């Protein structure tokens, strides 16, 4: 099958993860999945929410938003509308859950890390790009906290890596990492979050048109795992590179 951008069914879009995009944030990344671009920052603060105080455990949370012209038509800022949309809440919670899956709260100590993921340009897969980029920003923020002795020596707050990718069935063919044009044509689409050792954190799947069977589900999950494996390699390479 020939895809819109010439990729094979099992091929990711070109992925880049550029660290050090903010001079202020303890961790920052511009992540690109093809034409989808998300700016992720990680901010470290000493202390935890009231309900966490005295536990000796840290906390990680996330917020997600889109710039007004991230899509082909301008959307009002949610701050202007005076209400955060349900989709925004859902994706923010998804990003937070995904990152907390690889955090050792005790090792983090009573510190809070907030990930802010802002979509600069959307062409499908914004939430999966946000998770993948936010992990790298989180890793840099953790390293910063360790360097400032906010995290006790010898402790490792990160227990592994986490990344995410979209998969879907378009024209009867399972595809990896859908762009927007593929996403709107998909009979089935799914977002899959995996740890670096191949375990699932979250699987969000919906039949948009035709219901899917177990064989198709397995094919999509296999595609997603292979995609997340590739993303984990890209994340590691980004973290090993020297920031500018």
From Swiss-Prot:
Subunit structure: Homohexameric ring arranged as a trimer of dimers.
A GO biological process held by the record: tRNA processing
Taxonomic classification: Bacteria, Bacillati, Actinomycetota, Actinomycetes, Kitasatosporales
Entry similarity comment: Belongs to the RNase PH family.
Keyword RNA-binding tagged: yes
Origin: domain of life: Bacteria
InterPro entries listed in its UniProt record: ExoRNase_PH_dom1, ExoRNase_PH_dom2, ExoRNase_PH_dom2_sf, PNPase/RNase_PH_dom_sf, Ribosomal_Su5_D2-typ_SF, RNase_PH, RNase_PH_bac-type, RNase_PH_CS
Name of the protein described by the UniProt record: Ribonuclease PH
Role this protein plays: Phosphorolytic 3'-5' exoribonuclease that plays an important role in tRNA 3'-end maturation. Removes nucleotide residues following the 3'-CCA terminus of tRNAs; can also add nucleotides to the ends of RNA molecules by using nucleoside diphosphates as substrates, but this may not be physiologically important. Probably plays a role in initiation of 16S rRNA degradation (leading to ribosome degradation) during starvation.
A Pfam family recorded for this sequence: RNase_PH
GO molecular function: 3'-5'-RNA exonuclease activity; tRNA binding; tRNA nucleotidyltransferase activity
Record organism: Streptomyces avermitilis (strain ATCC 31267 / DSM 46492 / JCM 5070 / NBRC 14893 / NCIMB 12804 / NRRL 8165 / MA-4680)
EC number, as in UniProt: 2.7.7.56
Residues binding phosphate: 87, 125-127
